[in-house]
């Protein structure tokens, strides 16, 4: 197994990309700590599935914009699972579409706290317990193209994740590798809420693969970046969008 004997933390692991990633890492031998904020049923279901297959896992609710919640997650992971080898920084969101001219500072700060500052805080807390390993960040296609109307703040936060990924890879290598993936249209609750159906159909018609991505597509890439199959890759921001950039 590609991650036998290793421990992974997956933030935002109660649904969609995070849940699929937690299950995928566990299927390759990792013990998994699943952070969630509101998706308790999905997080618990993932833990039950992992344990049913002979693995180790737990789920813990936490707001990763709060230091106490981060500290609790890291401490429980180290105590119960024995350390930290893989960190998947998946927590994030758009919150709501708001154009810059109409946006309050509080909304801007909330997006930055959720998508960027929480990644800094989580990464710093985990690095205290990582001698070697991998960090996988979730950026976005929006960081490449600026996002749609009302998503400028979201795109900016994800652009910062891409830059932080490159810089951190230089700062903490060679012992720890850091990479990010930049998903395009993935069939998730995020797009169910924030992307009109017509836009989703248009995406499917325009990209070379003629479909939206699945959470399994992203989980496969997360596994690749987390394990030694990608041993010569660090500081990379990898597109996973069905060919959107050149369609």
Segments the model singles out, each with a brief description of its role:
Residues 7, 14-16:
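Conserved glycine-rich cofactor-binding loop
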Residues 101-120, 136, 161, 209:
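Catalytic Tyr-X3-Lys loop
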Residues 128, 169-174, 231:
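Alpha-helical segment proximal to the catalytic Tyr-Lys
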Residues 123, 157, 165:
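Active-site helix of classical SDR
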Residues 103, 146-155, 167:
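Active-site loop-to-helix junction immediately N-terminal to the catalytic Tyr of the SDR YXXXK motif
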Residues 98-100, 107-109, 191, 199, ...:
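Substrate-binding pocket helix/loop in short-chain dehydrogenase/reductase
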Residues 140:
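Residue(s) in the substrate-gating loop at a strand-loop-helix junction
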């Amino acid at each position: 197994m590609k991650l036998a004997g290793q421990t992974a933390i997956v933030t935002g692991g109660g649904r969609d990309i995070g849940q699929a990633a937690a299950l995928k890492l566990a299927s390759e031998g990792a013990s998994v700590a699943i952070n969630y904020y509101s998706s308790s049923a999905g997080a618990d279901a993932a833990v039950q599935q992992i344990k049913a297959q002979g693995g180790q896992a737990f789920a813990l609710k936490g707001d990763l914009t709060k230091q106490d919640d981060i500290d609790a997650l890291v401490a429980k992971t180290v105590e119960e699972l024995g350390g930290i080898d893989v960190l998947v920084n998946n927590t994030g969101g758009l919150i709501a579409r708001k154009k810059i001219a109409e946006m309050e500072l509080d909304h801007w700060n909330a997006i930055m706290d959720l998508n960027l500052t929480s990644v800094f805080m989580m990464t710093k807390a985990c690095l205290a317990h990582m001698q070697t390993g991998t960090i996988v960040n979730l950026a976005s296609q929006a960081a490449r193209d600026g996002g749609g109307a009302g998503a400028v703040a979201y795109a900016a936060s994800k652009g910062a994740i891409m830059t932080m990924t490159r810089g951190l890879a230089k700062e903490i290598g060679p012992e720890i590798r850091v990479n990010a993936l930049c998903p395009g249209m993935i069939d998730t609750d995020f797009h169910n809420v924030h992307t009109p159906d017509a836009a989703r159909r248009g995406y499917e018609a325009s990209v070379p693969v003629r479909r939206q991505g699945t959470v399994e597509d992203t989980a496969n890439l997360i596994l690749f970046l987390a394990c030694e199959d990608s041993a010569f890759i660090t500081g990379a921001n990898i597109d996973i969008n069905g060919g959107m950039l050149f369609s």
